[in-house]
């Protein structure tokens, strides 16, 4: 099973707002939804999916295990709790949201617990998020690269994360990009704007098309129907070599997500 290239993010969306966003997205044809224990919206996402009437087997649902639930005695019970909230017997993908701060729980312990969850049928695939190269090495040592479906990382035109991407690719680990639009900063970029005009597209479509063209999955979020519909069209936009080179030149290692006490030592 391959991870869909395009999905719906739900970070920072809660209650009625996330219910409306998910229901609208599913109506428009989205089939992948990304949530997490710490987003505090799994129950709302579950409600939206249930009310949408879309058959479960058409959906690809991702959740993420929070750092408090990484130990082997907590991980599986916490995932079962997530499943209850999401109103499903299984998720398609479960990620370790952040590596354990200060290595409080070893990579080996939580990866093996996550693999056990997969063996129990609670999740179809497992993966990681915010993992550096040394952490990916440990994760592979714990469960084998074949079991690591993706590394979900911050990745935008301003933070192209080439080192991590190239290493992951060489080891068969797919990349999912979050914060692809750099909190909207990249939408104001002149280079992006020029490419958008050239293709009669929006800056958002250009950035999402660029990321998908690089082989990454994207999970943009929106609360507005027109934006959800417009974002979806990024799948039909194909950039040429000139466009790709222009965006490659925007990389300036501008990282926006690095919570103190949580972030690892970045590559």
Swiss-Prot record:
Q: Which GO terms describe its molecular function?
A: aldo-keto reductase (NADPH) activity; methylglyoxal reductase (NADPH) (acetol producing) activity
Tell me the InterPro entries matching this sequence. Answer: AKR, Aldo/ket_reductase_CS, NADP_OxRdtase_dom, NADP_OxRdtase_dom_sf
What broad class describes the main subcellular location of this protein?
A: cytoplasm
Gene Ontology BP annotations: L-ascorbic acid biosynthetic process; methylglyoxal catabolic process
Its cellular-component GO annotations read: cytoplasm
Pfam families from the xrefs?
Answer: Aldo_ket_red
Signal peptide range equals none
**What's the superkingdom here?**
Bacteria
List the catalytic residues: 39 (proton donor)
- Keywords (A to Z) from UniProt: Cytoplasm, NADP, Oxidoreductase
Where along the chain is NADP(+) bound?
A: 179-231
Reactions catalysed: hydroxyacetone + NADP(+) = methylglyoxal + NADPH + H(+)
Q: Where in the cell is it found?
A: Cytoplasm
**Which residues of the sequence carry a binding annotation for substrate?**
97
Instruction: Tell me which EC number(s) this protein carries.
Output: 1.1.1.-
Oligomeric state and partners? Answer: Monomer.
Q: What does this protein do?
A: Aldo-keto reductase that significantly contributes to cellular methylglyoxal detoxification by catalyzing the NADPH-dependent conversion of methylglyoxal to acetol.
Q: What family is reported?
A: Belongs to the aldo/keto reductase family.
Q: What is this protein called?
A: Methylglyoxal reductase DkgB
Organism of derivation: Salmonella typhi
User: Gene name?
Assistant: dkgB
